[in-house]
Amino acid sequence: IPDGQGYEEKFYFRPGNDGFKVWDLFGARIGIGVCWDQWYPETARVLALMGAEVLFYPTAIGSEPKDADMDTSRMWRRAMIGHAVSNCMPVVAANRIGTEHGQSFYGHSFICDEWGDTLAEYGREESGALVSTLDLELARQHRASWGFFRDRRPQLYGRICQDI
């Protein structure tokens, strides 16, 4: 997590050491990446390889404390949609709204399908429960037909796990 005002999470919370988890919920296997985990494609891929069928990303992200004019909402949204597309599965991204200590959280919670198409979304200051119907069987077929998991080459990925 970056240093600076608005990014003090690492001083109050410790990351868990039991890895990512996938749960059965209402007939679907869900994987959850919390806040900072959302920026790493490895999180999405590991959850997918563990059998997740839907990726959830609850977060609190907004304006940059040192540069209030910098709006990273488009970059955040593209990263989340990238997880959906590269893992061929729906993503549910829930983001905080409001202002605290000078940081404005930009909302824009959304649900997208495995193609990255938006199924439901809120604006910058809207809150509530987004609802959408997901066709998990169609997503499974899509995942199988693209071969992203079948054609992986793990023998080439060792560097990603080494310290820099």
How would you describe each model-predicted region?
Residues 1-54, 58-59, 63-78, 145-146:
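Active-site catalytic loop in hydrolytic enzyme cores
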Residues 52-57, 89-90, 108:
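Conserved active-site beta-strand-loop modules that form the wall/rim of enzyme catalytic pockets
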Residues 77-81, 90:
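Membrane-associated lipid acylation/remodeling enzymes share a hydrophobic transmembrane-juxtamembrane segment
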Residues 90-164:
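C-terminal beta-strand edge segments of enzyme domains
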